[in-house]
Amino acid sequence: MNKDLTVGKPSQVLWQFCLPMFGSIIFQQLYNIADSLVAGKFIGENALAAVGNSYEITLIFIAFAFGCNIGCSVIVSRYFGAKEYREMKTSVYTSLIGSAVLCVVLMGIGLLGCDALLELINTPEEILADSALYLDIYVLGLPFMFFYNIATGIFSALGDSKTPFYFLAVSSLSNIGVDILFVAGFKMGIAGVAWATFLCQGVSCVLAMVVVFRRIRAFHTEGHVQLFSWNMLGKVAVVAVPSILQQSFVSVGNIILQSIINTFGASVIAGYSAAVKLNNMVITSFTTLGNGISNYTSQNMGAGKMDRVKEGFGAGRNLVWLLCVPLVVLYFFFGRFLLLLFMNDPQGPAIDTGMLFLRILSPFYFVVSVKLVADGILRGCGLMVRFMIATFTDLILRVGIAAVLSATALGSTGIWMAWPVGWCIGTALSMVFYVTAIRKALAEPLAVAEAEGQAAEVRAEAEFAADAEMETL
């Protein structure tokens, strides 16, 4: 079902649109959490550390898939909001072809270079072989991840957040069962964990793509629809490339952090691996709402309803704060019970490390959630430079502070303390950019977009605004 995000009360529209997206991202996170949970419970602490260590490298591939998702989603959303269905179809087909080429290149790089990267980040010898095996199988499944992300981006652009939720719910729950079957039943070890994810993501991807093509063909268009357009690829790339660079930069920063953490041994790696999975569920949920706001913003820009963009920020902020309250209480006071899902020793150094991580970070969810809402609007408006500056500043500070403090008497605790500092400064920057840029965008959308180098999209935005003004007159 397609949904028009340009009408209705913003808070209600965002809630109805984003609620299934929250469910989808929770099930998406269950893929990696299930891998860690089964590895830790049925194989051992070293297996948990191996999956967690590999996860930071997989984030590089996820960054490219996520960037393709955002680029496709924003452009498709804009044409859908403007009712220009022929261009919308061309943007869909172009995004799929471009993503396929990128995926093939990344598979080659991954299969040839992951082993060297594992050694570069100080992976302990006792988990090196398992980490390499997990990554090799993961890379083989990249096409499934890429095309599924493109599919979800298209669904979101059309205002449909329920369809991907249904696919992921079934696939993620199946993944848990297949994980246990392969590891506990067939005794496949770490390979069983990876192959289970490969299989279930493949099923989810195929189903999603079938529905996407049916949905797109249902739109009536006149004239020839191009299957590929270099001009359209350029428009998608204007949004996708900054997102890919931003996410890749974040991934590289996380890999540097992982290399610092690896110097403290397998127990600290295991504790961090479990805790960061819980943390990522929260951050990814906030990011998902930000993505929803990006689609909301883009559709309303396409329809020339810039006043609704500003209203979307307040509605989004209130939604994430409602989520923060129970999550902070749960992680701060009851995090140990959640960590025990991943490990068997309730008193060991691994669980103590994870609990300290959660207690340091969780109170600052109220801060970083605001940043991610503001970032969503900046992306939806095409103000990618501002978005990237705020994100890069956060990460650079986090890595730098972690490197310095970890070398002091604080040890690994100093690494965890770096997160809140980076979040606070990054949020301040995002808010400054949001307040200044969105005011200019409301008054002079053409000038702001040109200042950001979005020349191709500026003309379309100007036409949308002109049409809206004529309707008002």
For each feature predicted by the language model, list its residue ranges.
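Hydrophobic transmembrane alpha-helices of multi-pass small-molecule transporters
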Residues: I60-A63, N175-I180, S204-M209, M281-T284, ...
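Interfacial/gating helices of multi-pass transporter permease domains
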Residues: A39-L59, E125-D130, I190-A191, M232-V239, ...
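Transmembrane helical elements of multi-pass membrane transporters/channels
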Residues: Q16-D35, I137, Y148, S171, ...
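Helix-terminus/linker motif at the lipid-water interface of multi-pass membrane proteins
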Residues: L30-A49, L118-E125, L181-M188, S248-K277, ...
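Residue-level signal for short hydrophobic patches within transmembrane helices
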Residues: S11-L30, A34, I57-F64, L140, ...
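Short runs within selected transmembrane alpha-helices of multi-pass transporters and secretion channels
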Residues: N69, Y138-S156, P164-N175, V193-V206, ...
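Small-residue-rich hydrophobic transmembrane alpha-helices
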Residues: L48-G108, M145-P164, G271-G335, V368-A390
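Short alpha-helical transmembrane segments in multi-pass integral membrane proteins
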Residues: M1-C18, V76-G141, G185-V241, T297-F364, ...
